[in-house]
Amino acid sequence: MITKEMIKKVIEKVSEENKKECINIKTHVDENLTIFDSKFGGIPYLPKDFEVPCDSSSNHEQLALLAQINCTDLPENNIYPEVGIVQFWIGRDDLMGLEDDYKVVYFENIDNTITREEVLTKYTPLDPEDYDQYSPFNPSNAEFSLTFEKGVST
């Protein structure tokens, strides 16, 4: 007969065998984020020679920044590079990139001379009238600072 204790041991064994390194993310409200910071939403880092990713529609609308991770903010890990910035972009429509309109970008070398003003000549933030429909954030124009800590998932 199978007992609760036997089931508990099997669950513990399977959990132990399937542990994986992960990085836990915590969000914080921060009104002083730069284009180089790790964040959800906001204004991205964009190198001088980089064009903002666009969707597949005939209008080629710019994608919106979902998240940006500055790899130097991460704890030691075997998941992400040690340096550079990883960005996650999503479509500016009601599907928010769930089908085809998303992109992941990695910049290994960061030009610290680029300014927010330079980025804003290329990147158009979401129109305030579209925030509620096309933003995954609440409030819809929010920008959140990210901090990271090493963890284990089971």
Where are these regions (language model features)?
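Preference for intrinsically disordered or flexible, low-complexity segments
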Residues: 1-154
